[in-house]
Amino acid sequence: QTANPPFKLDFSSTRDAIEQKWSETDRFFAGVPKIPASKKESMAIYLLFIQHIMYCMKDNGKAAIVVPTGFLTAKSKIEYAIRQRMVDKHIIKGVISMPSNIFANTGTNVSILFLDNANTEEEAFLVDASSLGKKVKDGKNQRTVLSDEEVNRIIDVFTNRKVEDDFSVSVPYDEMTEKGYSFSAGQYFEVKIEHIDITPEEFNANMAARKERLTALFAKGHELE
């Protein structure tokens, strides 16, 4: 299955009926979004689509779902419960976070979830492609266009599970559990600290120069008072 569900829609008139009709099933296991006091058009209907797709998938079924990137780390009850089940059941095979304005009709940052009910991997593969692409004008709007080379890079890295610094990472499901079921690649990238070897003499000279600079700045500050 491939799905690009609407992210937000006013379904307040049918919300309670949906919850009641499926309350005895596992279709909407994480819950149905509440009706807000205002801006009913902002109801997150995509959360129902995700749960519906998971419910309908066959034992060997696969799905790719476009979601708002905020879903990857949201702490709200429904989003959290959905990610938790995906991780606990090992059906989240991977995630690709796309650049902003990749779709002309929405400025919402989007990511793609890849689900696999027959997944045998012990790790999910996460790609952060948000920095790729070139900004172009599209009428009154601005969107991001990926070059063929960038598209091929994303496909190659994701398909072959190639780990690249600050771009892709393979994360054990246990680690995802420890980090609150986050699907954000950036939270799992290795933090690298560069070390520069210098002699004690070089260190002392460096510190003396910094001290002299600070003294000069303080003196200048007093002159301006």
Name what the model sees in each region:
Residues 2-225:
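A conserved structural/catalytic subdomain of Rossmann-like adenosyl-cofactor enzymes
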